Amino acid sequence: MNVPGDLRYTKDHEWVKLLADGATALVGITDFAQSELGDIVFVELKPEGTVLGEQEIFGTVEAVKTVADLFAPVAGTILELNGVLDAAETVNQDPYGEGWMVKMKVADPSSLDALMDAAAYTEMIGG
């Protein structure tokens, strides 16, 4: 299972990557999540400008087997949606790269410290 060391993780299998500006982050679902969901056929995200609290639902992922909610790993505002996700299978193919979901302005960048690092997430998923 692919668990990049430069990301932070949630118990709900979202990842977050703080970008170089220190205030903006990319958010997506983990490789573990996409493999458990199976073939992803549709991604629905809240619109740009939506203000989210930590753990607030920011969208859903529809797979052949199920529909799953997406939870914001940190509080912030959605700045951009990943237009590539019109081809939802991108999430299965590249969950940490082209398959990111939203770009957020993070309300408090230090809140990422409360999320799991790669080692803790790997342990949680039994890796």
Curated annotation (Swiss-Prot):
Any GO BP: glycine decarboxylation via glycine cleavage system
Cofactor(s) named in the record: (R)-lipoate
Pfam family, one: GCV_H
Swiss-Prot/TrEMBL keywords: Lipoyl
Record-annotated Lipoyl-binding domain positions: 24-105
Modified residues (N6-lipoyllysine): 65
Source taxon at top rank: Bacteria
Keyword set includes Chaperone: no
Classification via InterPro entries: 2-oxoA_DH_lipoyl-BS, Biotin_lipoyl, GCV_H, GCV_H/Fam206, GCV_H_sub, Single_hybrid_motif
Subunit field text: The glycine cleavage system is composed of four proteins: P, T, L and H.
PANTHER family noted in UniProt: GLYCINE CLEAVAGE SYSTEM H PROTEIN (PTHR11715), GLYCINE CLEAVAGE SYSTEM H PROTEIN-RELATED (PTHR11715:SF3)
This protein's name: Glycine cleavage system H protein
